[in-house]
Amino acid sequence: MKNKNSEQNTHYTIGEQDIHYFHEGKHIYAYEFMGAHKACEEGIEGIRFTTWAPNAKSICVIGDFNYWQVEDKNYMEPITDAGLWSVFIPNAKNGDKYKFVVTNKDTSHYVYKSDPYAFFSELRPNTASIITTETQYTWSDDKWLEKRAKTNYYDNPMNVYELHLASWKTKNGKFLTYDELSETLPQYIKEMGYTHVEFMPLHEHPLDASWGYQPTGFYSVNSRHGDIIGLKRLVDKLHNNDIGVILDWVPGHFCKDQHGLIYFDGSPCYEYQEPTKAINKGWETHNFDLGRNEVKCFLISNAMYWINEFHIDGLRVDAVSNILYLNYDREDGQWIPNIYGGHENLEGIAFLKELNGVLKHTCKGVITIAEESSSWPDISTPVEKGGLGFDFKWNMGWMNDTLRYISLDPVYRKYHHNLITFSMVYHYSEKFILSISHDEVVHGKKSLINKMWGDLWNKYAGLRLYMSYMIGHPGKKLIFMGSEFVQFVEWREYEQLQWQVVDQYESHKQTLHFFKKLNDFYHNETALWQCDYDHHGFRWIDANNSQQSILSFIRSSKDNKQKLIFICNFTPVTYYDYHLGVPDAGSYKEVFNSDNLEFGGSGQVMATEIFSSPQSSHGFEQRITIKIPPMATLVLKLIK
């Protein structure tokens, strides 16, 4: 098995070692020989096609090179008893479209299939694979990759901008190409102060409305936006602007369209044999058989493909709960317990551990993030310590609790104060990312601004308050596109964001400015990210002031030289002469205030320093007396 950390060769032939590791489930570069590859055999240039179909009777390759006719010379030959098939076709070339005609050995029924390992595919509704051998690109991101390999993301800033390429911006109603995006996206993300962009799935999928989460071409770059070189150029440009690239990745299930992986050889192949495990009724997809060696190779090699070929810096693994639980989204009687009588998917657990183990060993500095909605333990604990091995986990509990809280009338918030404080009870159990993702602004859930309580002024103030509280809360950050300039309608994947409102309305322009300033503040203050997962980095001042719906806490840097005091007022009431305990004697200065006039607030700011007095309050020996603006987050800093 070739240990490969660079782009694929123009010529590569399958060897005995490749075959052995593939069937053992240990090949992590299967894309180097599976699929369609340029080859020279007996002095003749052509393409070698290889696929896996253990229950096939025959497989014929048809395409542009043979006028889509089934011909004897284009039938694959079995090269192992375990289902590997291969054929060399001399006149096939780069750019030719093709498919596999797969005949089942039991029924003699045949199906037309796209190549599971194809690097490029036709734009929907067409479904043919496309021979793609010209994928070489000269990268210019060496400095970024060197820095990435040395970075400890736990004690560095991470502020992620989640993005759906098809609807971020369009041009005359048409998708932007990767090259067109390269001209605007990196600059925008850099100017806004985000450290990473997270792309929703970029592999080929037939249905736009699936957002990429029901893929058919796991190795095929989304053809809506261009080709492989274009995507590489976009990633390169992002890296040269010091922006990391995270990719949403879907290893749990796949689309059931007939040209895809479903019943690839006429019988369960990539999916489980048992219908209770294979069929995902909730999403109308099929679940991967994660205990099958060749399927594990397909998926882990796919992760390696995106990381090696496109220099992806991290994978956000979608729907981890669906991988972990046999009874996920199933009623009693619709699932079969494991060998120990439990609901845990033992094969799924082993797969996730193996995936994370491989990436940790081979891809220095690449991170994995779990989207997991249950309380499964040790998701972000290293594999060698008994965990699943992810670097981070989305904090779905924090998201649900706080969005519920912020939608309440402030009159009633006092009765639900735990919703805004409970997250710190379990925060240190995982390496959490606080995420306000695409899932929260669709399907009737309302846009982020419309989740806020009150009239228009209070909605804007509530959004600024909430986002400032989020920046202060321990954990890395993620927000979905459009929220930064206050899109009022829910996200619609079929049209671009409503960018025009920034030019039309001052309130939208002010909020965009607020997000930029907030992101800059986060990036510049070590206390906000250096100790996200260390108890030293956070301390409550007062978590129990439910009557006034005020939170106050301290964020500290590792060396304790930086301390920030957050005061979050979740009511539309101004509090005068508010006594607050502080850890140190001295003078305190306001360093951020979400009520600032330049953000659209009421302008109740602290223009002068506040001096502490030696009076006990909130368990501290010193206290300050301040005015707290309505629906606002105030941040103070000890200056001397």
UniProtKB/Swiss-Prot annotation:
One of its GO terms (molecular function) is hydrolase activity, hydrolyzing O-glycosyl compounds. It is an enzyme of class 2 (transferase). Pfam families: Alpha-amylase, Alpha-amylase_C, CBM_48. Gene3D superfamilies: Glycosidases, Golgi alpha-mannosidase II, Immunoglobulins. Its EC number is 2.4.1.18. It catalyses: Transfers a segment of a (1->4)-alpha-D-glucan chain to a primary hydroxy group in a similar glucan chain. Belongs to the glycosyl hydrolase 13 family. GlgB subfamily. This is 1,4-alpha-glucan branching enzyme GlgB. It comes from Francisella tularensis subsp. holarctica (strain FTNF002-00 / FTA).
